[in-house]
């Protein structure tokens, strides 16, 4: 008692944990194990926690080389958070009774990582929708060439850690490690750091560690391909948060190991940030309005055009209807415009994005084309100037007519962008922009824009925004936009970044200039190009791809481990069940073995069914890939057959002006024929695509899919039915239990007949009286068969309850002492044990059932006339009194019996 008071006084004086423990050890008040336990109870990190963190690091390195499923990541995060929460809470409640909880959760974390390493051999991408393509990248493809080698190494490593931990926990001063040396190392490795030094170290070192992790991933990206840094970071962060909340309330100090953990978290976050290719654009995603990010350089956006001009690459049949359009909040639009005002080109849709359309149209209007190298100030369309050897390489086209008037002058032009770019703007053409109009949308295809508007109409549009010298101003009405690589030539030439058009009419370029400017000004007045982050959005791709882009990894390792686990379970269950059922009834033992064999047969059947379905899936995917290649080849053959050269996902008619039928006038009939042929190609490609998709869906609609793993199937073996069916089963069991209770109550009433029968008046119709010495009166041994049956039922129920109580107490003791080597087989054989008890109880009930022994009327023992006594009839005691002969307590028994005998 005095020692406790002294320890309390020393604790009140504010001595550190290290000093107090060292003093206790030196004075011999604590053994080495007690000192370690005291250190743990004081809130320091448990060795098992360090082992768990080490195993988590193994999982992170495991994720570097192979791909971890999302479900496993959430399981790890949940387990670690739950462990820390229970561990820290239990220290406040009871320091001794919860020690096994921490050990259990550490084992669970290690076991989960072991399962993860095995599951990686069977991990695969989920089946994709045919029109959604998973584009493989260098930083997402798994680099695990021989997964089974990595799995064996990880299993051996984890088993080694478990062995070391078990040795350390069972060691004392005479064993492998000296306990005092262990304590000294533990104390020296956990020197306390005052908060005034700990917080600056964390605030300065954590960003540095994150930066180091970032550059480590940048320099060694091929090594750290797809790590589980997010798993380790989040789980450690939440676990430390739960622990540090309690530590902050208790005003405890930080130690070296805790600071190292936080630095590890920062390092992991830096590695993860680099893995997702974080850069200035990701920072812009965070600072920009939710869901959208301003695009500063619109010339880099992948544009595709719609036009009424007959250009194959701009045909509307390639796109069909707009596949994305939604209304957006006015507040968001206002924020987008405010962000756009800070960029000179955010709202300027570049005219040179028309280059592809102009090039296609110019090819149809050109007599000649050649490559030239020119510099600014050179008019290549004039015969007086010639090309030079230096300058900008461009394509020069000599046109027959005016491109603008022929193809664009009386048409409208519509532009679409490829995901993840979208256009934010208005549907209407109001001159004044109002953020409260309610017409703001985000779409992939802008509405058609008329290109022949006059200058007066264009002047009514909202001016383009730019941010120059801190003030909002307008750009000049130049063709090429702000700060683009456009070259100026003579009066007869018009140029874009890589194209020179030479027209016969000197004013032709002015016409094209006005039309291009018309489109640019109208589009820029109503639309802003933004980029949508890929978080939560579905990527719509250009081409159709098969559901699986990668060859299925071998499942031999996972299947072998799965069968090995089942074999161990079966052997353990058989041995434990055999030893448990030695003292059971022979019939029950036979029935249980039959049931057990049937269950094993069913499990084996499920395994082979699952294996055959996986083989079927492989055949389906192989057929799917072959059919896709046939589909692509058939499309190309059709394109070549119609004279349209394949170019990406489009094809081009490479016909010269003479083939089209041009001399000096437009031959609409010839061009219409070419358009009809192109439409035939589109229809044929669409039909091939539909047939291919239908065949692909029909091949895989009755299969499980390749994403189902062996361990998911192991879980499904125990997932018998849904929760609704379980509710129905529980209700049926309750109803049956009530019916059984009612039936037993009726049988108990029948059992009382013998006593009532013995106390009836001894009167006969013929005047003969029954001797009072009749053995049938007052002899409890001559009770009814129902009473004997009820006694047997009670004995069987008591025996079953006693056996179950012993089994339950045994399980509880094993669970409390963490004897997993004995608890696991006990739990595995528990269903068979319950089945045996049930069968034995039913056997005892039906073996002594009266229906099996009652063969007719029971011959009475009393009476001199030798008459047979009637069988026992139930006596209803209306008052519940045990005095059966009391005429005031119910019916007149004598009158009832006399009437009954008179009726005979």
Curated annotation (Swiss-Prot):
Gene Ontology biological-process annotations = symbiont entry into host cell; virion attachment to host cell
Q: Which GO terms describe its molecular function?
A: structural molecule activity
User: Outcome of mutating residue 216 to I, per the record?
Assistant: In strain: Isolate R29-106
Q: What is this protein called?
A: Envelope glycoprotein
What the entry lists under Pfam families is as follows: BIV_Env (PF05858)
According to UniProt, where does the site described as Cleavage lie? 555-556
Positions of the region Fusion peptide? 556-576
The gene that this protein is the product of is env
The glycosylation sites are 131, 255, 277, 296, 329, 367, 376, 385, 410, 427, 432, 452, 491, 509, 541, 597, 663, 694
- Would you say which domain of life the source belongs to? Viruses
């Amino acid at each position: 008692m005095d020692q406790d008071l002294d320890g309390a006084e020393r604790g009140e004086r504010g001595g550190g944990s290290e000093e107090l423990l060292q003093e206790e050890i030196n004075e011999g008040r604590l053994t080495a194990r007690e000192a370690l336990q005291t250190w743990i109870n004081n809130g320091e990190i448990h060795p098992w926690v360090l082992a768990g963190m080490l195993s988590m690091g193994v999982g992170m390195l495991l994720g570097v080389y192979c791909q971890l499923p999302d479900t496993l990541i959430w399981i790890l995060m949940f387990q670690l958070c739950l462990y820390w929460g229970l561990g820290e809470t239990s220290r406040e409640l009871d320091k001794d009774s919860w020690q096994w909880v921490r050990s259990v959760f550490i084992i669970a974390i290690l076991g989960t990582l072991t399962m993860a390493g095995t599951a990686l051999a069977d991990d695969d991408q989920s089946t994709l929708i045919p029109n959604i393509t998973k584009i493989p990248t260098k930083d997402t493809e798994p680099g695990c060439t021989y997964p089974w080698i990595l799995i064996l190494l990880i299993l051996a490593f984890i088993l080694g850690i478990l062995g070391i931990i078990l040795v350390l926990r069972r060691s004392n001063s005479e064993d492998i490690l000296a306990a005092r040396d262990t304590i000294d190392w533990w104390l020296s490795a956990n020197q306390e750091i005052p908060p005034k030094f700990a917080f600056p170290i964390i605030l300065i070192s954590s960003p540095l560690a994150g930066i180091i992790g970032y550059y480590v991933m940048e320099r060694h990206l091929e090594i750290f391909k797809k790590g589980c840094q997010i798993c380790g970071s989040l789980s450690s962060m939440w676990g430390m948060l739960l622990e540090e909340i309690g530590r902050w309330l208790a005003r405890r100090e930080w130690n070296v190991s805790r600071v190292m953990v936080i630095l590890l978290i920062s390092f992991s976050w830096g590695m993860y940030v680099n893995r997702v290719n974080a850069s200035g654009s990701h920072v812009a995603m965070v600072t920009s309005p939710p869901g959208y990010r301003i695009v500063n350089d619109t010339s880099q956006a992948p544009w595709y055009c719609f036009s009424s001009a007959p250009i194959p690459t701009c045909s509307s049949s390639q796109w069909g209807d707009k596949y994305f359009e939604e209304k957006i909040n006015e507040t968001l639009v206002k924020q987008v415009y405010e962000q756009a005002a800070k960029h000179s080109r955010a709202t300027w849709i570049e005219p040179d994005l028309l280059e592809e359309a102009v090039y296609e149209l110019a090819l149809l209007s050109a007599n000649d084309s050649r490559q030239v190298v020119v510099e600014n100030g050179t008019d290549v369309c004039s015969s007086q100037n010639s090309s030079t050897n230096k300058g900008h390489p461009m394509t020069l086209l000599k046109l027959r007519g005016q491109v603008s008037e022929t193809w664009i002058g009386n048409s409208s032009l519509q532009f679409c962008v490829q995901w993840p770019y979208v256009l934010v703007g208005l549907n209407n053409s109001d001159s004044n922009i109002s953020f409260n109009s309610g017409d703001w949308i985000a779409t992939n295809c802008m509405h058609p824009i008329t290109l022949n508007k006059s200058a007066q109409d264009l002047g009514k549009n909202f001016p383009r925004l730019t941010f120059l010298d801190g003030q909002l101003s307008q750009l000049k009405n130049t063709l090429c936009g702000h700060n683009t690589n456009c070259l100026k030539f003579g009066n007869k030439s018009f140029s874009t970044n890589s194209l020179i058009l030479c027209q016969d009419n000197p004013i032709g370029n002015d016409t094209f200039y006005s039309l291009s400017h018309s489109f640019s000004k109208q589009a820029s007045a109503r639309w802003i190009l933004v980029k949508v982050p890929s978080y939560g959005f579905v990527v719509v791709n250009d081409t159709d791809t098969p559901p699986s882009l990668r060859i299925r990894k071998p499942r031999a390792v996972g299947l072998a481990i799965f069968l090995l686990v089942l074999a161990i379970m079966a052997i353990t269950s058989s041995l434990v069940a055999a030893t448990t059922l030695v003292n059971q009834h022979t019939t029950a033992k036979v029935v249980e073995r039959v049931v057990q064999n049937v269950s094993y047969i069913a499990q084996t059947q499920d395994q082979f069914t699952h294996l055959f379905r996986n083989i079927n899936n492989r055949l389906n995917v192989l057929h799917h890939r072959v059919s896709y290649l046939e589909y692509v080849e058939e499309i190309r053959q059709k394109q070549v057959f119609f004279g349209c050269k394949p170019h990406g996902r489009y094809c081009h008619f490479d016909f010269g002006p003479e083939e089209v039928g041009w001399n000096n006038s437009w031959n609409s009939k010839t061009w219409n024929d070419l358009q009809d042929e192109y439409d035939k190609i589109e229809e044929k490609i669409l039909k091939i695509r539909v047939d291919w998709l239908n065949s692909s869906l029909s091949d895989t609609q009755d299969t499980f899919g390749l994403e189902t793993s062996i361990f998911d199937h192991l879980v499904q073996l125990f997932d018998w039915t849904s929760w609704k069916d379980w509710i129905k089963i529980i209700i049926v069991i309750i109803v049956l239990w009530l019916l059984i209770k009612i039936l037993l109550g009726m049988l108990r009433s029948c059992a009382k007949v013998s006593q009532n029968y013995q106390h009836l008046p001894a009167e006969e119709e013929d005047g003969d009286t029954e001797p009072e010495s009749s053995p049938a009166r007052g002899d409890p041994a001559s009770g009814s068969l129902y009473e004997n049956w009820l006694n047997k039922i009670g004995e069987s129920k008591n025996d079953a309850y006693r056996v179950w109580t012993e089994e339950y107490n045994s399980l509880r003791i094993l669970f409390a002492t963490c004897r997993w080597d004995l608890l696991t087989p006990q739990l595995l054989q528990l269903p068979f044990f319950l089945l045996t008890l049930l069968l034995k109880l039913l056997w005892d009930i039906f073996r002594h059932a009266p229906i099996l022994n009652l063969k007719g009327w029971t011959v009475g023992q009393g009476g001199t006339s030798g008459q047979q006594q009637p069988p026992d009839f139930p006596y209803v005691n209306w008052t519940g009194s045990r005095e059966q002969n009391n005429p005031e307590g119910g019916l007149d028994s004598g009158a009832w019996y006399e009437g009954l005998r008179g009726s005979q």
